[in-house]
Amino acid sequence: MQIFRSIVTIIVVGTMAAMIFSLRSELAEAKAKSRGGEARSVIAGRPHVFSMSCKVPSCNKELNTKEGRARAVEWFRKNHITKLWLETYRHGERVETNLLEEERDAFRAAGFEVCGMITPTKFNDPPEGGEAPFVVCWSDPKALERLAEESVRAAKVFDTIIVDDFLFSHCDDRCARCKTLKEKRRLKDWGMFRREQMKEVACGPIIRAGRKANPNVQFIIKYPCWYQDWTKNGYDPVSGTRMFGACWIGTETRDANPDPAQGCCLMEAMDRLSGGKCGGGWYDALDCSPEKFVEQARYTILGGARESLVHCYDYLLAKDPGLTPFGEKADRSHACAEAFSREVDGLARLAELLRGAERTGWEWLVAFAGNNTGVSAHGFRKGGRRYVACVNTTDEQRMWTCAEGKPFRKVLSLPDEAAGRVMMDGPNNPAVGLMPHGLLVFEDPNDEEESDNGH
């Protein structure tokens, strides 16, 4: 199946989805459908939600006063944010319960949906003269007790809680506790051990403990963007989602990532893997330019996300954005916030255009010499019309023509009307010019209905 039957040469990119689907043999059918294009996915019919997370530092500082919350509310409203995720625990620090309740109630009174978030890090005792390890050894009974305590505390405040993607383990033969337990269970490799251990951690100290405090609580597991290492570090997206009942996916794409469309692939693939239980995509402003930051937002929406979670208030809006998880200064995040503000009206229009649409696949456009142009083309159908959304991920302008001389009709361009230009280069040679890091949506000039087999 091709999106552009009449425009330039193209190649189908299915490698990302194929890698994910190959995690489990029973997903072979889903893999074939995704790569072949004959199975279409329909994006949710309800309005897209833009949400933002607020980490422990901002909850304890900027947001702990009426004045600070008022400034935040003003920005949220200007930027389509209607839902907040307040973090209760991170890296050994917590927001006290009374402050969580105060902030929850204040934001709800201002008209926002408010949920909770836990980042399960630094639950082990620190070594003498040092700090607790960032990644937790889950064979430590004290760590399990501390996680259960935080799960209970969060469940008493919120009915919906997302667990950030730090449930994985790095323990190996150097960890005496885990090595002994692995040998006792006669497990073949560390990947099997970590996956079994993560199931126990999820069922016990998180889900079971939280539901004792609040029978209505819904915990959500968030999967990281580093899909290549899921299974060896403990993540099983099929059984994990089944346990939690819902999941999220990280759609972050750093500057150095060779596949800028990874977030789109992960978003669609996780929705398939979870049986439609993936609530949305999560992206942040770490290690990326402002252009790449809004590109993540576009790809999250184009991947079919029901909700886009911008992580986080601290990076984008706090006076001191602090350090990244890698110990580096988050030095470009304020510029990312400005870029998001310029883009968000267009993102909302893009999400509304895709609302209830049938996604028909996506492809990289290639030049006649066979080189990847850095422009991805995403097809969808809505209201009896076929559309194509093109994203230019490069620093250069891209241009292509319609071989059959059919006219293009522009529907949307981002970040502004000049980003995508539909022009005439001769009487019978319509052309499209897409500016650097621009997005253009237009009606497919070859708009005949496809047959049921997709050809």
Describe each PLM feature range.
Residues 10-22:
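Bacterial N-terminal signal peptides
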Residues 21-33:
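Signal peptide processing junction and immediate N-terminal pro/mature segment
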Residues 30-405, 415-438, 442-450, 454:
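Glycan-processing catalytic domains of CAZymes
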Residues 411:
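Short glycine/Trp-rich loop-beta-loop segment that forms part of the substrate-binding cleft
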Residues 1-9:
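N-terminal Sec-pathway targeting helices
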Residues 17, 24-26, 187:
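Helix-centric, low-specificity signal for extended rod-like, repetitive segments
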